[in-house]
């Protein structure tokens, strides 16, 4: 062979190798798994045909014995090059025919040549979205064992594992990923996360947790980032096992590293479920401060916890924020809760305003009854009488006689003695029907007092 011939041969070899490299490095579709339950954690799988090499190379390389493999003939180079040209031209059927024709002469080929032809054939099937066909061809590639380059073997093993997962052949996905791990140079955490996802699909939560914990350990040892979806998957797995202490720990990591509404609200929910009410309140308050509260239950739960902790002013502010955010409807029940919070916070004017709105919406007179007491304490006797009358008109009261007493007292303070006496007479009548002796006595004392006061005023008027 002349020097010129050798140069041309090397050029052809180089061109064919470049084509082969391109074929092996075309991206696979990124596969995401949406998990059910907690606001939706997911795992992103490695997305390139060359991803296996990248995953392994994140760690320091360890020395391995160089593998000797048979070389590719010029005829195979040409077939691979022709196949790649047809792929680039989007002629997948033509590319398929080209490689299939080449494989008809497979008896002439060594293991490496057979592997490279089946590798391209697998890629063509993949582009045609025939994943079963792609898997069949890629499995032929790895079956050539030690007679193909290590890079081709490990890359194809990784691809077979991923495609098996996509095809829901979980046993094969695990099998080929385990083989890949045994051959890879210091693999990173990603294969462990992949296997955890597979075990999750198989409902083997114990093994899924084991793989997730191992993956996180590897990532932390190398100083690489553990993604939000990976922590979320681990949280979900602990949740499935009802391992609440670990659910709390992983959620604490999530709110620290990825402070989002879903993580704060879940953390608060688990704290509440486990009886840690103060921690539940602190979590919801943190979410409130960050502007993460969105739902009615978010605001009402926090307000309720604040009321339990005897901080009614903050509870009222939370409910007001819920109204402003239009997360809470202004119904009588919520308005009554807001009114009670303002009342306990000594914000009487705010309480009265809210109770007035709530009383109109309520089906019974209980809120009007509460208003009558507030107006009595605030020396607003006209409004006290109106509220007491509203309570009696709507009914549904626990003790009707008590409302008559309040109404009578306000009427007395307005110097309406006749009306006040009528209210106390009605009070005594209702108290007798319910055998309420204490209120019978109170109302009787008021009637006697008003009669004496009326007589005294008559005498004063006569003397004048």
Which residues make up each language-model segment?
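Solenoid-like repeat scaffolds
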Residues: 65-71, 103-110, 142-149, 178-186, ...
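N-terminal leader/linker segments that initiate helical-solenoid repeat arrays
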Residues: 2-10, 32-143, 151-155, 201, ...
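Residue-level recognition of tetratricopeptide repeat
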Residues: 84, 123, 162, 197, ...
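Alpha-helical adaptor scaffolds
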Residues: 154, 332-346, 353-401
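Generic helix N-cap/helix-start motif at coil->alpha-helix transitions
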Residues: 72-81, 111-118, 149-159, 184-194, ...
């Amino acid at each position: 062979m002349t020097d010129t011939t050798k140069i041309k041969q090397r050029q052809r070899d180089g061109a064919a190798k470049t084509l082969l490299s391109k074929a092996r490095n075309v991206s696979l579709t990124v596969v995401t798994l949406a998990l059910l339950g907690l606001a939706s954690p997911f795992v992103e799988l490695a997305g390139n045909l060359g991803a296996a090499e990248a995953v392994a190379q994140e760690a320091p390389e360890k020395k391995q014995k160089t593998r000797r493999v048979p070389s590719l003939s010029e005829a195979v180079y040409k077939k691979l090059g022709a196949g790649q040209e047809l792929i680039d031209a989007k002629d997948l059927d033509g590319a398929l025919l080209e490689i299939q024709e080449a494989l008809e002469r497979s008896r002439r080929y060594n293991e490496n040549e057979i592997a490279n032809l089946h590798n391209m054939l697998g890629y063509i099937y993949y582009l045609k979205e025939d994943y079963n066909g792609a898997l069949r061809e890629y499995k032929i590639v790895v079956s050539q064992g030690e007679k193909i380059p290590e890079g081709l073997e490990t890359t194809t093993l990784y691809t077979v594992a991923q495609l098996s997962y996509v095809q829901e052949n979980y046993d094969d996905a695990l099998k080929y990923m385990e083989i890949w791990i045994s051959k890879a140079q210091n693999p990173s955490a990603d294969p462990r996360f992949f296997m955890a996802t597979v075990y999750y699909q198989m409902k083997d939560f114990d093994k899924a947790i084991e793989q997730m914990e191992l993956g996180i350990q590897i990532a932390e040892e190398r100083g690489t980032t553990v993604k939000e979806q990976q922590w979320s998957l681990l949280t979900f797995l602990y949740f499935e096992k009802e391992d609440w202490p670990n659910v709390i720990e992983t959620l604490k990591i999530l709110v620290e590293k990825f402070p989002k509404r879903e993580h704060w609200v879940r953390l608060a929910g688990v704290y509440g479920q486990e009886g840690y009410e103060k921690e539940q309140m602190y979590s919801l308050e943190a979410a409130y401060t960050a502007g993460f509260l969105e739902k009615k239950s978010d605001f009402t739960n926090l307000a309720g916890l604040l009321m339990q902790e005897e901080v009614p002013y903050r509870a009222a502010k939370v409910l007001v924020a819920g109204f402003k955010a239009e997360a809470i409807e202004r119904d009588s029940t919520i308005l009554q809760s807001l009114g009670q919070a303002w009342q306990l916070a000594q914000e009487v004017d705010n309480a009265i305003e809210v109770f007035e709105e709530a009383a109109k919406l309520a089906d019974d007179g209980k809120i009007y009854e509460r208003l009558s007491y507030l107006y009595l304490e605030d020396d607003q006797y006209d409004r006290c009488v109106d509220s007491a009358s509203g309570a009696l008109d709507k009914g549904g009261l626990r003790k009707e006689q008590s409302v008559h007493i309040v109404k009578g007292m306000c009427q007395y303070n307005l110097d309406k003695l006749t009306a006040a006496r009528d209210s106390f007479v009605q009070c005594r009548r209702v108290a007798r029907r319910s055998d309420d002796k204490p209120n019978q006595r109170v109302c009787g004392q008021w009637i006697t007092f008003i009669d004496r006061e009326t007589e005294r005023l008559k005498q004063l008027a006569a003397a004048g």
